[in-house]
């Protein structure tokens, strides 16, 4: 099949490399890992890592500055460069494992797909000058192999998830609509907009006010009572497998059996809630939840199959070789045109969990990669 998108390798802008630091080059033919004895070359892994760095630079630097890659942004003892490289080499392992199991699902690349991959790789090389190519460590063979692996991954995922159970019962999919008022038990905004903590006396008074509000809502409507008490009515949906609502709130909602039913005052650690069941079955939300369940089953199956293959394989990473890949320079993207995104694409988006970075195009850089 000829699919519509690759990893949009040739689309929205021109990248410029800067801030060069000790760029002595790397040997693209060096073995960075082995998979059941198969040598995985550094060239593809390096290209994937630099591609991801180039894509992320503008966003990260706008928030965290030029030292982003050497910073421990999340306080876990790992720099952003280390974290990104760890994700990339994990992706590389996945790609080659999937390639080695193509026969398990009768997955092949058509002549048309292979030709499109070759054309895209050649176009990428033609669109970038020598300095740009060196900055990403790209060769036509490396780009071709990377796009081949990504395309195989997409086709393998499609084949694997075809076995997922897509039969979701109405009961499992059912999603209800509700309205609610929530009132903070701990703090409030004063006239100047500053956050103030309630005193114990104020907390007792607040509890009484919320009870009176509930009684007013029961006598009139939730909306009318909210207007009277200066509260805001919000809305939401919930299903039986909801994991985001407080347990007390979900239990109260599940106890409402008829549309229009009002809950008692529900108390959580930080809020009071008054809830109203609006629709036992929200048709649109129910269908959306059905698709979410199917999507989760597909992802779970894909991950289970892939992990099984990985468990059975022997992947050995040469840490010293992988350490040679560094993000010593930074990239800036200049958007030229969005039309090219439609004209230069070749394979479907890979699955959401494929960890492949998208949107790199023409690059202007000066790093040497051998």
Task: Name what the model sees in each region.
Residues 113-123, 237-244, 324:
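Short linear loop/turn motifs
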Residues 208-249, 283-285:
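Peptidyl-prolyl cis-trans isomerase
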Residues 1-10:
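Bacterial N-terminal signal peptides that target proteins for export
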Residues 24-137:
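N-terminal targeting/tethering segments
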Residues 49, 56, 92, 96, ...:
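Sec/Tat-exported extracytoplasmic proteins
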Residues 18-22:
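C-terminal motif of bacterial Sec signal peptides marking the signal peptidase cleavage site
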Residues 26-28, 35, 132-212, 244-370:
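PPIase-associated folding chaperone regions across multiple families
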